[in-house]
A protein has these predicted regions:
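Bulky hydrophobic/aromatic packing residues
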Residues: 1, 82, 117-118, 152-156, ...
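Conserved Helicase C-terminal RecA-like lobe
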Residues: 1-142, 209-217
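Alpha-helical scaffold elements adjacent to nucleotide-binding pockets in ATP/GTP-utilizing enzyme cores
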Residues: 9-13, 92, 117, 146, ...
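A generic "structured core" feature
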Residues: 76-78, 89-92, 121, 149-151, ...
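Short, acidic/turn-prone active-site loops that include or flank metal/cofactor-
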Residues: 106-110, 154-159
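A short beta-strand element within the Helicase C-terminal
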Residues: 142-155, 178-182
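A conserved SF2-helicase RecA2
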Residues: 157-217
């Protein structure tokens, strides 16, 4: 659930989005997806104002992830849409399980490091247990079948990105069952995004105008 700080920020952002919608200031898909992103960032525990530093908000998402991790065995893929989240997750996992246990894989990861991370993750003898990646970067074309758990810290509204990232652990060579876990804040945009993805709906093409209002209310 959201913390009181998150609830306050979420309600304020939602009301602002409704005002924009009523004033006709969200006539494009891009503007609506931007508001979706801002609401989702709050559920993840931060606010990123335009041209301003990230403002962390007290949240339960990271503790919830650590509780999930404590209950699983083996290697895990953790997908997160925002670099800020990837860095926070890696820091928490490194503190709990050791720096060698975790690797970040996102747009700023050096090309030379990317293959090395994949090789180490796939090596059952390697201490690298947690692959924390952005689905747009790590979700395409690489094999990560060493994982038996896939956790979505948050979800992109891009259906193709979700499907591709799911497949990283479920490719040829996977000999065990894979558990998929979604971290979701109840009664927020998180639930709407996950519901759409499970229904194989690409939000980037469908959420406009009154559809978006229905999501907010």
């Amino acid at each position: 659930p959201l913390t009181p700080e998150q609830k306050t920020a979420y309600v304020q952002m939602k009301e602002l989005a409704l005002v924009y919608l009523d004033n006709g200031e969200m006539a494009t898909t891009a503007s609506i997806l931007t508001q979706l992103m801002r609401l989702q960032q709050i559920t993840c525990g931060f606010i990123k104002p335009d041209d301003a530093p990230i403002q962390p908000i007290k949240n339960n998402r990271l503790p919830q992830l650590m509780e999930c991790i404590a209950e699983i065995s083996g290697k895990a893929l953790i997908w997160a849409t925002y670099t800020h989240d990837i860095e926070a997750i890696c820091e928490a996992l490194a503190e709990e399980y050791g720096a060698d246990s975790v690797a970040a894989y996102h747009g700023k990861t050096e090309q030379d490091d990317r293959q090395d991370i994949v090789v180490k993750f796939q090596d059952t003898a390697s201490p690298l247990r947690f692959f924390v990646g952005h689905p747009k970067t790590g979700g395409y074309g690489i094999t990560l079948t060493a994982a038996n758990t896939v956790i979505y810290y948050n979800n992109s509204y891009d259906l193709e990105s979700r499907l591709q990232s799911e497949d990283r652990a479920h490719r040829i060579g996977q000999e065990k069952s894979v558990t998929y876990i979604d971290l979701v804040s109840p009664d927020t945009i998180d639930e709407k995004i996950l519901e759409a993805l499970r229904g194989k709906i690409n939000l980037a093409q469908t959420v406009l105008g009154e559809d978006f209002r229905a999501w907010l209310l």
